[in-house]
């Protein structure tokens, strides 16, 4: 049908993701085109992050995996956030990047 549904999943969005995304998954392929968390001490301009990254990031990745969605994590740059890496040596951020790295490593097995 040539249609793919793309959603950007962030903790400051007060959205029921199952209601907004999963409801159409049987009709269209799903891409979570962006997701991320700035870390527990951050105050992003987009709004508050009501859940800790230790809770929110694994929960969202489990949701993506459970539904077999495709995803891209935002952002592979140390100064554009939410940052997956601390610097260009590719060391993952403790609050977000470590979870993405672990998720991708499991997918590669």
Regions found by a protein language model. Name each.
Residues 73-81:
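Short, solvent-exposed turn/loop segments enriched in Gly/Ser/Thr/Pro and often Arg
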């Amino acid at each position: 049908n040539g249609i793919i549904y793309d959603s950007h999943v962030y903790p400051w969005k007060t959205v029921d993701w199952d209601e907004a995304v999963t409801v159409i998954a049987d009709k269209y392929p799903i891409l979570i085109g962006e997701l991320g968390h700035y870390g527990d001490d951050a105050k992003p301009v987009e709004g508050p992050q009501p859940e800790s990254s230790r809770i929110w990031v694994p929960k969202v990745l489990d949701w993506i995996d459970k539904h077999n969605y495709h995803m891209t994590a935002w952002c592979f740059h140390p100064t554009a956030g939410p940052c997956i890496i601390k610097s260009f040596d590719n060391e993952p951020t403790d609050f977000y990047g470590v979870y993405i790295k672990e998720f991708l490593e499991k997918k590669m097995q």
